[in-house]
Amino acid sequence: LDILRVQEQFSRGPGGMRMHLHYAADLNWRILDDYGSDELKAQYMDKFQDKTIFTCFALTEQSGGTGADIHTTAVKDENGDYILNGEKWLISHTDCCEFAYVIAVTDESKSGDERLSAFFVPVDTPGYEVTPMPHMMGARGAAHTGLKFTDMKLDKKYLLGEEGQGMEIAIHSLSVSRAHIAASNLGMCQRMLEMSLARANDRITFGKPIASRQMIK
């Protein structure tokens, strides 16, 4: 609860502050901790603790996709490694991350969420590209971009969990994030109420602040 109280207070300021805290406090490291192989956790979990790595979470696509309509693919090559192609949209923290959690289709023959798998992708992998998108109102200090994968070869060791577990991993990880979003909304609403009250007291019409008018009350 303490971190949610902090989240609430951070959310009274610029959007970048609340977004970074909300992600860094949990989603940033939890996916690897919960679903990474022993090899990946041994290699990278300490780096989260000393803050030498950060991640982004790449699920959403421009089609509106966060589930069955995801189109980014990860196809196995002859060595069992993966070749990723596709695009993501509305992804935060792409300007400050070393890795991306990417949800992609690994088996087109399956239905629904069983098609999807999750990967821990180093952003310096050839074929990984950050693409621009319009700035989001209300998110000052936080970058949002697209991501594009073009014949991006990824070692099979970067698979998280098992094939077909991608949406389970995404939803499990996002569930804690929702508590942070609720605390953020509370902090933002409190600040907006304060600003509205201040404006109502400062704005004078016909010799009186509008806060004294029956409609405003």
What are these regions (language model features)?
Residues 1-42, 46-52, 92-99, 112:
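Internal helix-loop-helix
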